[in-house]
UniProtKB/Swiss-Prot annotation:
CDD domains per record: IPMI
EC supergroup of this enzyme: lyase
Residues reported to bind [4Fe-4S] cluster: 306, 366, 369
Enzyme Commission code: 4.2.1.33
Name of the protein in question: 3-isopropylmalate dehydratase large subunit
The UniProt record lists the keyword Metal-binding: yes
Length: 425
């Protein structure tokens, strides 16, 4: 029976063919928790009477949302995680000593492998599909069950094939591809579907951008986003192996040519501009030319998050900001996604460029993205952010506004004091 890549991953795990709509129980290759969600899982784990993790080397806790802790409550959450990690001698425990946002850190650590089934107690766990894995977010109780058994249940999703055709223009990145898709299909246009990203644009899309693309699959309601293994995946893993061993060998799957899709969406990117998603939904995408005409003044620019806090994002921002100054009315906050990215940006002189331009460079953290700290918006304030959500109150006050963009638009806007087109600089 012809199958998609997502279906093949599940079929390989349970030893037989699967079809959409079927409910299965499946071994999980990597289970992920963070400082916010894991304490609930730990409580359920302890209440179950379990004494040890089913797969300790396949379980990771990443302290990333409020690290270093912002207050007593977040410090206590971190302590619950630390105590559990030390008690169980958890190998894959990451805190201030080796910090990063989970969805960018774990691929760096060689813990995300093509062909994996991955679950995490965070909705943006779908990021890891960029490496050809099935990866999805679940609730803390589901995570606890997997901690105890090493398994989880899944309903096999139908797949939507998204074909990006043509060639990307100047300052058009993975972020713009996913914003365009969400603009077309809406925030529930892929509800419980697997979004399979294909086409000549994807074949030439760098891994950082593929991760941005898969990261926001959930913003269309998708169960997962996925890109098939290819030379770019291989090159990424070879780079990872220079500083971390891979957890296991890749298991490579490709969709059959006659696989069944619930929908095929073709997007010609030849004329696609950088996009800006207006408040209060990621689906409110508008071309940068329209945003410039709307003359939208801003108070803050935030470059970071699991979507766009990568080294390539910092390089893009530095290229635009070099020799320039942030507008006197604007705050620019830059948050590298991992400590390795931070160190490499420092090595390349990127941090000096950003600081000289007037930016604040924060430690790796989710921080302001979820309205946590390190860049919260006040009443009536307006921000351009390279994050993934712009719901009302997402980054602070309920009367604030967040406009989502790529890093080039964000950097240009920081200079102009209003939403600006980086192609005009």
């Amino acid at each position: 029976m012809p199958m998609t890549i997502t279906e093949k991953i599940f079929a390989e795990h349970i030893g037989r063919e699967v079809k959409p709509g079927e409910i299965i129980m499946c071994d999980v290759d990597m289970t992920i928790g963070n400082d916010i969600t894991t304490p609930i899982s730990i409580r359920a784990f302890n209440e179950s009477g379990a004494e040890k993790l089913a797969k300790p080397d396949n379980f990771a806790i990443v302290l990333d949302h409020f690290i270093p802790p912002k207050d007593i409550a977040s410090a206590n959450q971190a302590k619950i995680n630390r105590d559990f990690a030390y008690k169980h001698d958890l190998k894959n425990f990451f805190d201030e000593k080796d910090m990063g946002i989970e969805h960018r850190l774990l691929p760096e650590k060689g813990l995300v492998i093509p062909g994996d089934v991955i679950i995490g107690a965070d909705s943006h766990t779908c990021t890891h599909g960029a490496l050809g894995a099935f990866s999805t977010g679940m609730g803390s109780t589901d995570i606890a069950f997997c901690m105890i058994t090493g398994k989880s249940w899944f309903k096999i999703p139908e797949s939507i094939k998204v074909v990006f055709k043509g060639e990307r223009g100047e300052h058009v990145y993975g972020k713009d591809l996913i914003l365009e898709l969400i603009r077309r299909i809406g925030v529930d246009g892929a509800l419980y579907k697997a979004l399979e990203f294909t086409g000549e644009v994807i074949e030439n899309l760098p891994m950082d951008d593929r991760m941005s693309l898969c990261n926001m699959a959930i913003e269309a309601g998708a169960k997962n986003g996925i890109v098939a293994y290819d030379k770019i995946t291989e090159a990424f893993l070879e780079e990872v192996k220079k500083y971390n061993p891979l957890r296991s060998e890749p298991k490579i799957h490709y969709s059959d040519p006659d696989a069944n899709y619930s929908q095929v969406i073709e997007i010609d990117v030849n004329k696609l501009e950088p996009l800006v998603a207006y408040p209060f939904l990621p689906s409110n995408g508008k071309p940068i030319s329209q945003a410039v005409k709307d003359d939208i003044e801003i108070d803050q620019v935030y470059i970071g998050s699991c979507t766009n806090g990568t080294l390539s994002d910092l390089r893009i921002a530095a290229e635009i900001l070099k020799g320039k100054r942030v507008h006197r009315r604007v705050r620019l906050i830059v948050t590298p996604a991992t400590q390795r990215i931070y160190k490499q940006a420092e090595h390349e002189g990127i941090l000096d460029i950003l600081i000289d331009a007037g930016a604040v460079v924060a430690n790796p953290t989710c921080g302001a993205c979820l309205g946590g700290y390190m860049g919260i918006l006040g009443d009536g304030e307006r921000a351009v952010a390279t994050t993934n959500r712009n719901f009302r109150g997402r980054m602070g006050s309920r009367s604030s506004e967040v406009y989502l963009s790529n890093s080039a638009v964000a950097a240009a806007s920081a200079i102009a004091g209003k939403i600006a087109d980086p192609r005009d600089l």
